[in-house]
């Protein structure tokens, strides 16, 4: 405590007022000093004596079990046993007091002003320096990448970032001038019209028309806008009203059930199998009719779905009717009498819906729509009865092929036939796979399902973007650009002999014949998990366990929990899917703070794991990495996976090469970041191996 010196403050006051002022200050100082002595000095002395007695009574030897004492002070190498203090409490100048020598301060006699003289004076203990934890940013965990919400965009908004504990705004004079010019241009170009004005323009246009120059000038003068703005607004209202009228007429012409089904079909995503999908909303084509879907299902290499499957009955019937003196097989199929099977109206509606969804495939309709109501054979007979005159079944092609197979086919020739058919299917690669099969690097473009009616031509967006047609496309199954999957043995899709692996694609259970998807142990007849396909890591989400800790390189880092083998899958790099313009705007901040979470995905999208992502966002950059990033195609979507570059030991920190070049940020190459300007700093996936 220090007595306030106000000698200079009283120069302008009369002597009487100055004397009163000094008296009040002395009384106030004395009151504070006595209060401190009565309240705080006794507590300090009591606290010190308590710790002294506690320290003297604590044994520094062993506990009851003969081990070391588990108390905190006994486990410290240099325990803080005593308080270091000065016994000269009368020296107020050492404590910061400035007392007036002329003033007599009365002190309480029973108040101790110093500690016990038996307390030894020990040097102060200096606590060790503990490094602070690296600075972290709050983020949201997500298993898969998600499209950025429009409200999360930073384009045209003020951005605040923190550097060395100081909040800075990311803006420059040039940016502010450009924003002001853009705002002025928007104000000049765009005119807002209220509902009443829209109604007025629409009524005048419908009653009198806007072709007359007098009418247009009158409206422009009355509304105080340009004639071009009025014409533009009238055209917008015309399109809007015509579209509303068309939708209303469509709804009135349909029943409520049909309208609801059409709406559900438009809102259902066939890639995510959910309604109102925000991931593929603007990339999803319209669903095809049942006539187009009929060509998707073939009888080649199909297995019977149940004991009452028409395929099983056909095979038994054909085996019983083989004639030794005839080189043909009977075309008859023993089926139940369709007149003995009654179909209710509900079953007929379910049958029609099953044909619309699964096409003319009695097995899928029986298993998914009419399970427990009708057998596969009954559905097949009903389908033949309904389509006998108007449609031909895909089974006819297979039946004709069986009619040409004789009884005396040698074993060697049948083996060669199977081999030729298999080679004929996979020897012709789609045009989009020529770059990857030849070993060259390929930059993927965003996949949008095509809506081709039959086979794809030069106008097909898949061919234009050099992508394969997927099962979600509208083209037929025999399209030359459609990827047909693989036919590898179970668990053997681990090298470039597999077409899916060679094309940097994940096996699809719907396309690959020997890659079923199961979550059981094999007791029910399904494929056990242990022998499932090894090229479905993204679909099965077989991510390795990753730990987050303090990195030896920069900030936080990712460490592996278990040891890993070479080329073993670690996990997927997830985050927000943003456009390149959004990535450039967000990258301006990352160039200044010296960290980047952006990852180039394709020609339209990038992944930003700064706000949303998983533990793989903490992998740091290294010129000698132990991991590598690889772009994979999973059911049409491009996704980024991380794999082991070499054998990785348990607890080792994970690194991968960001593939930064001269055009990227300076901090990525070990130099100080620039204060102004922006640069491209997104990571890029490794080219196809």
From Swiss-Prot:
- Cite the InterPro entries for this sequence: CXC_dom, EZH1/2-like, Hist-Lys_N-MeTrfase_plant, Pre-SET_CXC, SET_dom, SET_dom_sf, Tesmin/TSO1-like_CXC
This protein's species is: Arabidopsis thaliana (Mouse-ear cress)
Give the PROSITE patterns listed for this entry: CXC, SAM_MT43_EZ, SET
Domain of life where this protein originates: Eukaryota
Q: Where is this region: Disordered?
A: 1-20, 51-73, 169-188, 666-689
Q: Which residues form the SET domain?
A: 544-659
| Function description | Polycomb group (PcG) protein. Catalytic subunit of some PcG multiprotein complex, which methylates 'Lys-27' of histone H3, leading to transcriptional repression of the affected target genes. Required to prevent the proliferation of the central cell of the female gametophyte by repressing target genes before fertilization. After fertilization, it probably also regulates the embryo and endosperm proliferation and anteroposterior organization during seed development.
UniProt catalytic activity? L-lysyl(27)-[histone H3] + 3 S-adenosyl-L-methionine = N(6),N(6),N(6)-trimethyl-L-lysyl(27)-[histone H3] + 3 S-adenosyl-L-homocysteine + 3 H(+)
Which terms under GO biological process does the entry name? Answer: methylation; negative regulation of DNA-templated transcription; regulation of endosperm development; response to absence of light; seed morphogenesis
Induction per the UniProt record:
Maternal MEA allele is activated by DME but repressed by MET1 in the central cell of the female gametophyte, the progenitor of the endosperm.
- Could you tell me what this protein is called? Histone-lysine N-methyltransferase MEDEA
Query: What family does the entry list?
Result: Belongs to the class V-like SAM-binding methyltransferase superfamily. Histone-lysine methyltransferase family. EZ subfamily.
């Amino acid at each position: 405590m220090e007595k306030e010196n106000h000698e200079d403050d009283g120069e302008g006051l009369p002597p009487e007022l100055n004397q009163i002022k000094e008296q009040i200050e002395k009384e106030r100082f004395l009151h504070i000093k006595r209060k401190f002595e009565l309240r705080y000095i006794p507590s300090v002395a009591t606290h010190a004596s308590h710790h002294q007695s506690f320290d003297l009574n604590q044994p520094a030897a062993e506990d009851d079990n003969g081990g070391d004492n588990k108390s905190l002070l006994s486990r410290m190498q240099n325990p803080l046993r005593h308080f270091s203090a000065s016994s000269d409490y009368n020296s107020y100048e050492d404590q910061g007091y400035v007392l007036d020598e002329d003033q007599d301060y009365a002190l309480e006699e029973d108040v101790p002003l110093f500690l016990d003289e038996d307390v030894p004076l020990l040097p102060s203990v200096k606590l060790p320096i503990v490094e602070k934890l690296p600075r972290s940013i709050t983020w949201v965990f997500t298993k898969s990448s998600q499209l950025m919400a429009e409200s999360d965009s930073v384009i045209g908004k003020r951005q605040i970032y923190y550097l060395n504990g100081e909040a800075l705004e990311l803006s420059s004079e040039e940016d502010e001038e450009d924003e002001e010019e853009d705002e002025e241009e928007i104000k000049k170009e765009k005119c807002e019209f209220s509902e009443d004005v829209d109604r007025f323009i629409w009524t005048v246009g419908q009653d009198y028309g806007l072709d007359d120059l007098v009418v247009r000038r009158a409206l422009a003068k009355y509304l105080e806008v340009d004639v071009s703005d009025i014409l533009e607004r009238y055209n917008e209202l015309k399109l809007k009203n015509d579209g509303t009228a068309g939708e209303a007429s469509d709804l009135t012409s349909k029943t409520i059930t049909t309208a609801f089904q059409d709406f559900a079909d438009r809102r259902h995503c066939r890639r995510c199998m959910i309604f109102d999908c925000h991931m593929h909303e603007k990339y999803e084509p319209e669903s095809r009719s049942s006539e187009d879907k009929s060509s998707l299902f073939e009888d080649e290499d199909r297995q019977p779905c149940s004991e009452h499957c028409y395929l099983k009955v056909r095979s038994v019937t054909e085996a019983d009717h083989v004639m030794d003196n005839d080189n043909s097989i009977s075309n008859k199929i023993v089926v139940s009498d369709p007149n003995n099977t009654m179909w209710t109206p509900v079953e007929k509606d379910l049958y029609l819906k099953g044909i619309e969804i699964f096409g003319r495939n009695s097995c899928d309709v029986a298993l998914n729509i009419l399970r427990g109501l009708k057998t596969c054979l009954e559905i097949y007979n009903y389908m033949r009865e309904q389509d006998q005159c108007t449609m031909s079944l895909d089974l006819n092609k297979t039946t004709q092929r069986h009619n040409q197979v004789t009884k005396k086919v040698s074993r060697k020739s049948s083996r060669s036939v199977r081999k030729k058919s298999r080679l004929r299917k996979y020897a012709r690669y789609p045009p989009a796979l020529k770059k990857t099969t030849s070993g060259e690097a390929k930059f993927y473009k965003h996949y949008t399902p095509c809506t081709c009616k039959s086979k794809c031509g030069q106008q097909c967006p898949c061919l234009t973007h050099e992508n394969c047609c997927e099962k979600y496309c509208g083209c037929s199954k025999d399209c030359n650009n459609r990827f047909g999957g693989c036919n590898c043995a179970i668990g053997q899709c681990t090298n470039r002999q597999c077409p899916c692996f060679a094309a940097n694609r994940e096996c699809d259970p719907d396309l690959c014949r020997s890659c079923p998807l199961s979550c059981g142990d094999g007791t029910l007849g399904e494929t056990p998990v242990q022998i499932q396909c090894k090229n479905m890591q993204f679909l099965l989400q077989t991510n390795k366990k990753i730990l987050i800790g303090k990195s030896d390189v920069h900030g936080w880092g990712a460490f592996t929990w278990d040891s890993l083998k070479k080329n073993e899958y670690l996990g997927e790099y997830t985050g927000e899917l943003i456009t390149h313009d959004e990535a450039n705007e967000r990258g301006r901040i990352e160039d200044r703070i010296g960290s980047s979470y952006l990852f180039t995905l394709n020609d339209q999208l990038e992944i930003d794991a700064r706000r949303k992502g998983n533990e793989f966002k903490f992998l740091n950059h290294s010129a000698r990495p132990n991991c590598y990033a690889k772009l994979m195609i999973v059911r049409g979507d491009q996704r980024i996976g991380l794999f082991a570059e070499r054998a990785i030991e348990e607890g080792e920190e994970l690194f991968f090469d960001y593939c930064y070049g001269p055009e990227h940020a300076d901090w990525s190459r070990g130099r100080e970041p620039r204060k102004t300007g922006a640069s491209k700093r997104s990571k890029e996936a490794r080219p196809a191996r």
